Amino acid sequence: MARDTSSKSETDQLAEWQRPRQLSGTRLILTCGLPGAGKTELARQLATRRGALRLTQDEWLWALGSTPWDKPTREKVNHELWQLAQEVLRLGVSVVLDFGLWTRIERDEMRSAARGLGVGVELHYLDVPTDELWRRLEARNAHPPWDSAPIRRTDLDGWIHLFQAPDDAELALFDSPPEAN
């Protein structure tokens, strides 16, 4: 809908255009879970269904000739993807961010920043039993690019103790997907 600016001064018009837009339909959609939980597949489905930009950390790392094991590069990629996500959200385009988000503080920071942009925030937590995670990881490890830097069972076992699963109180802080309303 075009704005009627015929009776407004140039200063008033500029002020109106600079006001933050209400981005009511725009969403930051986060996936959360351990490796092998199905985050990337879910992110693909959500991006297609919602017409959103999907940003998957691991895919960017592999494309840059790195691996998820390269912590300095991973941190740089995460930072840049998060900056890009915020710019895209400001434009009114939904973003699916596929990072894993193992800690509550990461999820809190992203939720708070997105709320500051005036967008809704969803968290899709995938809680998968350890044996199923390992079965999926073994299958993934057999194919490129993961066959060159496979996840070991000892890695998974250690990560389970580091992962901070969202509880019901935290999940209640996020918006429900539109199809759930």
Model regions: which residues?
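Pre-Walker A adenine-sensing motif
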Residues: 9-22
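Conserved GTP-binding G-domain of TRAFAC-class P-loop NTPases and closely related GTPase folds
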Residues: 2-6, 20, 28, 45, ...
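Glycine-rich phosphate-binding loop used to anchor ATP phosphates in small-molecule kinases
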Residues: 72-121
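Conserved phosphate-donor/acceptor-positioning beta-strand/loop module used by diverse small-molecule
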Residues: 117-137
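P-loop (Walker A) phosphate-binding loop of NTP-binding proteins
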Residues: 34
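Conserved substrate/cofactor phosphate-moiety recognition/catalytic segment
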Residues: 37-93, 139
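Hydrophobic anchor at the beta1->P-loop junction of P-loop NTPases
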Residues: 31
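Conserved nucleotide-binding/hydrolysis micro-motifs of P-loop NTPases
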Residues: 59-61, 102, 127-133
